[in-house]
Swiss-Prot record:
It is a peripheral membrane protein. It comes from Solanum lycopersicum (Tomato). GO terms for biological process: photosynthesis. This is Photosystem I reaction center subunit II, chloroplastic. Keywords: Chloroplast, Membrane, Photosynthesis, Photosystem I, Plastid, Thylakoid, Transit peptide. Residues 52-78 are annotated as: Disordered.
């Protein structure tokens, strides 16, 4: 009995706290109908998708008077080469590949743009390449070292042949009186406008 009395001195009596919450009442504000916004009269304009005018097909400029683009002969023999030109890539089946032709006065060894060396035949030669840049590299080598003129073409998968270079029959390193200059500015680079002067104008310093 004494132990129970002693325990009761250190143990606080358990009492259920009284609920202080007020009874719930439905709020008229939370369920009130929302105020209707003032309707502004707006004119609905039908949206019409304006079809952009398709750019006109870029028509190739005709060759200058007196110049006839040479025709490609597919039966022209290829140089003697034991290696590989790297193939025509997959794009040749769906886009195009390039063919360079030249005529050599004798049989001689030359460097291939794809690596290695080959023997050009005496007379006409034809070489298929995957890139236009390879044709330009080989053509520059033919003219600088062997003094041989060249032509190259673009061949499409459907068999269509397009003559590319030299477009007007005169190589670009030569002066052609009838050729129009592209992007020419007859001034030194030091006389260009300052870059800050053309900022946000959509132009470049060499355009002004």
């Amino acid at each position: 009995m004494a132990m129970a009395t002693q325990a009761s001195l250190f143990t606080p009596p358990l009492s259920v706290p009284k609920s202080t919450t007020a009874p719930w009442k439905q709020s008229l504000v939370s369920f009130s109908t929302p105020k209707q916004l003032k309707s502004t009269v707006s004119v609905t304009r039908p949206i019409r998708a304006m079809a952009e005018e398709a750019p006109a097909a870029t028509e190739e400029k005709p060759a200058p008077a007196g110049f006839t683009p040479p025709q490609l002969d597919p039966n022209t023999p290829s140089p003697i080469f034991g290696g590989s030109t790297g193939g025509l890539l997959r794009k040749a089946q769906v886009e195009e590949f390039y063919v360079i032709t030249w005529e050599s006065p004798k049989e001689q060894i030359f460097e291939m743009p794809t690596g290695g060396a080959a023997i050009m035949r005496q007379g006409p030669n034809l070489l298929k390449l995957a890139r236009k840049e390879q044709c330009l590299a080989l053509g520059t080598r033919l003219r600088s070292k062997y003094k041989i003129n060249y032509q190259f073409y673009r061949v499409f998968p459907n068999g269509e042949v397009q003559y590319l270079h030299p477009k007007d029959g005169v190589y670009p390193e030569k002066v052609n009186p009838g050729r129009e200059g592209v992007g020419q500015n007859f001034r030194s680079i030091g006389k260009n406008k300052s870059a800050i002067e053309v900022k946000f104008t959509g132009k470049q310093v060499y355009d002004i």
